[in-house]
Amino acid sequence: MEEALSVFEALSNRPKAPEYPIVILHSNKSKIVSLGCFQVADEDFLTSYLRKKGLKYFFRLHGGDVMLHDENQVGIALITPRDEKYSETYFSLVNSLMKRNSVPNFHVTNDLILCSNKLLGEVMHLENDSSSSWFALIYLKRNYEEMAGLKFPKEQLVKERISMLKENYIGLDQVLEKQVSADVFLESAKTVLTDDLNFKINAFRLGLGEKKLFWRNRNMLRRNIISEAVQLKHSAVLREEGAILLSKRLINGFLRMRVKIKDKTLERISISGSFMFEPSEKLGDFEKMLEGKELDETLLVEKVTEFFINEKVKASFAAFEIVELLCGAAGGPNERGNQ
C-alpha cells in the first residue's frame, strides 16, 4: 500500500458529549479504502483477535487507537486513481452533504487507520468532463462491545480504550442529529453527485455471485496466487519492453516488486504491498538507491527483504489492488482514466 488512507472525522459544535466511536473515512489519493478499527493494544494482540473473529482481511497501518463501530452507522468513501485532480471531488461531496443536512461545522484530518470490515453495498462509477472515478457507500457491521468480552491479559486496557473513545468520538447520526439509513444516505449522495457536482453515475449493486468473485479474488491475493490480468493492470513499468514482475511474500504479509532490468542493470523498480513506512519517503529513497545498480533477481530479492527486516516492518494480509477487483466484481469497466 503506497499511501495512507485519510480519516474524515465528522465534528460539530454540540453541547452533548459524543456517544459512538465512529468516523467517516475516505481516501483522496490511494486506490484502497475501507472502514475499520485503529490499533487496539499492540499488533500481535490485535492480529490474534481479528483472526479469532474470522476477520482475515485488514489493512495494517501504523498508529492510532481502537475504532470499533455501532452497527447502525453509515460511512462514505471515494475511491479514485492516485492523482491530485481527484482530491477536490471528495471534499466537494462532503461539503454538499453536510450543507444539505444543515451541519454548520466539520473538520478534516489526515490520520492513519487499520481496517477490518467487509465491503458491502453500492459501488458507482462517476464521470464528468474532467475526471472519472469510483464512489462507494460502505456499511459498518462491527460492534465495539465485542471487545469488552475478550478474555485476554490486556482486557482491561481494551476496556479503557473503549471508554475513552466513547467519550471522544462522534458518529454521523450525531452530526446530522437524526438517524441515517444506508438507503437514504446513498440517495442523498447520488443527488449531490449528479445535481451539485455534475457527475454522470453508472451504479452497480454487488449481487451474491459478484461478492463471491470479489472475496475469492481477495483470498487469491492473500495466498499470493494472483492472475496475470490482475498483475498487469496497474503497472506502467510492465507495459515497457524488457520489464519483468517479481512477486514475493514477506514476513507475514505480501510484498510485490515491479522491476525493469536492461543489460543486467536495474533501470526502474516499484515496491508495493501491505505495509506502511514513516516517514513515507523512506521507501522511495530506498528504490532510488537500488536503481542504476547491477543486480540479478536473487540479489535484488535479498536486498529488499533485508531492508524490510531492518526497518522492522510487519506487513499484514491485505487486499492488493482492491479497487481493480471491486470494479471487476461490480461489473464495471476496468479502465479508469490513464491508469
Residue ranges and their predicted role:
Residues 1-85:
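N-terminal lobe of the biotin/lipoate ligase/transferase fold
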Residues 102-109, 196-212, 297-301, 313-317, ...:
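Flexible, glycine/charged-enriched surface loops at secondary-structure junctions
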Residues 107-153:
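A contiguous pocket-lining binding segment that forms or flanks enzyme active sites
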Residues 61-81, 154-175:
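Residues forming anionic-ligand binding surfaces in small-molecule and nucleic-acid pockets
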Residues 162-205, 215-224, 229:
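A conserved active-site cap/scaffold subdomain adjacent to cofactor or substrate pockets
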Residues 210-265:
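Structured beta-strand/loop patches that form or line metal/cofactor-binding pockets in enzymes
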Residues 71-112:
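Contiguous, small/hydrophobic- and glycine-enriched helical/loop subdomains that border
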Residues 260-336:
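Active-site- and interface-proximal helix/loop "cap" or "latch" segments in soluble metabolic
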